[in-house]
Amino acid sequence: GVLKKEGDQFIVDLAGANIPLPKEKTADGALDAYVGKTLKVGIRPEDIKDDEEFLEKHSTSHLNAEVEVSELMGAEIYLYLTYQGQNLMARVAPTSKSRRGDKIVVAMDTNKIHLFDPETELTLLN
């Protein structure tokens, strides 16, 4: 994603979805040198969900994705998703109705987003 800054708010642009980063994670100024640059963005599958409560709580981090595979794994479902040509994986509740071929909205817990320098692969968020 491309890192942007509006005022004191850092935003990562994920192919058109502008995701604001939590200010407490960006307050140290370490990201200033990366504004306008493309960074690697990482998030664990358990921090991407499709349920209404999670979508409401994380209303600034929605992505419109397509379900490629829905795999029931006992107490949870793994959703293999595509978003703008990128592969994502979400670990969702077994009550999820998302199935292969569905176009769904997922949200990310922005407190759990990781940014990496694409050259050094060092993490950039505290």
Predicted regions: what they are:
Residues 2-3, 67:
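Conserved hydrophobic positions within beta-strands
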Residues 5-9, 70-77, 118:
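Short, conserved beta-turn/loop elements at beta-strand boundaries and strand-helix junctions
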Residues 9-66, 87, 97-126:
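Glycine/charge-rich catalytic "coupling/switch" loops of P-loop NTPases
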Residues 60-63, 67-69, 73-80:
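Long, well-ordered amphipathic alpha-helical subdomains in the mid-to-C-terminal portions
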Residues 90-91:
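Canonical phosphoinositide-binding patch of PH/PH-like domains
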